[in-house]
Amino acid sequence: MKLITTLLLCSGLLLTLTQGEEAQEIDCNDEAVFQAVDFSLKQFNPGVKSGNQYMLHRVIEGTKTDGSPTFYSFKYLIKEGNCSAQSGLAWQDCDFKDAEEAATGECTATVGKRENEFFIVTQTCKIAPSKAPILKAYFPCIGCVHAISTDSPDLEPVLKHSIEHFNNNTDHSHLFTLRKVKSAHRQVVAGLNFDITYTIVQTNCSKERFPSLHGDCVALPNGDDGECRGNLFMDINNKIANFSQSCTLYSGDDLVEALPKPCPGCPRDIPVDSPELKEVLGHSIAQLNAENDHPFYYKIDTVKKATSQVVAGTKYVIEFIARETKCSKESNTELAEDCEIKHLGQSLDCNANVYMRPWENKVVPTVKCQALDMTEMARRPPGFSPFRSVTVQETKEGRTVSPPYIAREQEERDAETEQGPTHGHGWLHEKQIKANKNHRGHKHGHDHGHWSPRRHGLGHGHQKPHGLGHGHQLKLDYLRHQREDGDDHTHTVGHGHGHGHGHGHGHGHGHGHGHGHGHGHGHGKHTNKDKNSVKQTTQRTESLASSSEYSTTSTQMQGRTEGPTLTPPRAQPTVTSSGFQDSDFIEDVVATTPPYDTGAHDDLIPDIHVQPDSLSFKLISDFPEATSPKCPGRPWKPASWEDPNTETTEFSDFDLLDALS
């Protein structure tokens, strides 16, 4: 039993040790990186026995590992300064030495930071004297302090003594054990001096029960931890003659039990693909199909979660999604395994409770399901369309296209006019019927076109055939609709003014609303000109109608109107839904947009004056914006010298246009 406990605790400790923060790249110009480099350089310069101090040139790469403590790993370039190593000046107070005489180097360091205090973990610098091969900065020598491997066997007695000293001289309730050796240095004197930095962690062994560490003591994942630095002197007889230690403890989370308490009657999770669930799922889907009156069988598609609990038997709780199949209950007595799921069939979200007592062959399934919401996705081709904002609303007769916005005042005005008499309907809708012989001399025009607000004309009067400047009549034929009712109703846009005389009699009525007014009386004889004009106007193209629309707006008349002013009602066209239902392909969708009441809003829209050949927006550059890289960083101090090994060539006659041509 102790062996199993030890293995479980050791595996938990191993998992804890392997879970660390990932290193992330940082900006080489970051202030925190500079502080770490400054600390490293100040630790390096005192080791220079002769010559001058070294100064920071730039940081070329760096990473950061968050945690407690935070670790910075970086590479930086150094150059020899003009201050002596024994001058006592900070390297920031020096200047670079001449390029031909200055030595350069590259340092790789790892620096930790805890509570705004830095400490060196590792640092190695390689110095290259001017015009000389790269040499190591540190040379092995007898009597010098040098780093040793953290896995060296020589450290075992030192670390053992250090841990025992900490446990015996602290008032903590639990024993601590070694977690990791971070650095170790050794110096040969009349014996050996050791300088080590290591971390410790709390174990599950209390001092009341265990006087010292033993094999059953394991580290707690959420226990207290600390960092220590020890200095030990071992004489020539390998006996510890002197020892000093300084530690900093950090409290962890609340202590947890090494092993969870057993709970035989508690629910436990089961893998959704466990073979144990095969029989349980079979009982669940059979119960669902028996209780459901759907004409087709359902089949389990996805198992989301499953638990089991030991009671007076076994209780299973399963969450799954069932989908409709192609197998009908009329042609199949039971659900077969080869029944295919219907692609557009109904889906159910189900919760099943299955109670099983195998020794009694007793199975009690209970299944509760609810239908999943099916969202109808409108089919449309990809790409941008200005009609995406037009929404489609369901009605009893079909689908109606609703504009994205309707002014409130316009809605109220339309509601009032819908109750009054009307003479027609439609947007730019034209009704034309061949003339009755008994009404050859009369022509009635009704204008109910919903034009843009500044294009509406309001008029009532007699119109004369086009000629002699007495008026003109425009007939739009690209939205023509015929209805046979015995009368000749032609929707036109007409503006007439002045007085004229002729040999016949004709009259026309034009109704519209807007800012234009038309008035006047005219008499004319209906001759073959009328027939020819009708034929000609029916053959006009859409572009001609469009150009006439704009010309009409420039000929708006002002004056007194004769007859009542009628506001045509706003009609809602109905578009029958077909196999391909998409608002992008609804014909005349532009015409479905109701007129805006700009009269009430003109004062709210400011006048924007745009200079010629100017843009009201910024163009997107053809080239990507230049982003400064994180590394290498900027030179700490602009050097007035140039590297003699680097050749610099200036191109005074280079032009970017030469490369683009």
Swiss-Prot record:
Disulfide bonds join C28-C631, C83-C94, C107-C125, C141-C144, C205-C217, C228-C247, C263-C266, C327-C339, C350-C369. Keywords: Blood coagulation, Disulfide bond, Glycoprotein, Hemostasis, Inflammatory response, Phosphoprotein, Protease inhibitor, Repeat, Secreted, Signal, Thiol protease inhibitor, Vasoactive, Vasodilator. Glycans are attached at N82, N168, N204, N242. Residues 434-471, 492-526 have a biased composition (Basic residues). Residues 1-20 form the signal peptide. Residues 28-131, 150-253, 272-375 form the Cystatin kininogen-type domain. GO terms for cellular component: collagen-containing extracellular matrix; extracellular region. This is Kininogen-1. The keyword Secreted applies. PROSITE patterns: CYSTATIN, CYSTATIN_KININOGEN. Isoform LMW interacts with CRISP3. Plasma. Residues 405-471, 485-583, 626-661 are annotated as: Disordered. The keyword Iron does not apply. Kininogens are inhibitors of thiol proteases. HMW-kininogen plays an important role in blood coagulation by helping to position optimally prekallikrein and factor XI next to factor XII; HMW-kininogen inhibits the thrombin- and plasmin-induced aggregation of thrombocytes. LMW-kininogen inhibits the aggregation of thrombocytes. LMW-kininogen is in contrast to HMW-kininogen not involved in blood clotting. Gene3D superfamilies: 3.10.450.10. One of its GO terms (biological process) is vasodilation. Residues 541-555 have a biased composition (Low complexity). It comes from Mus musculus.
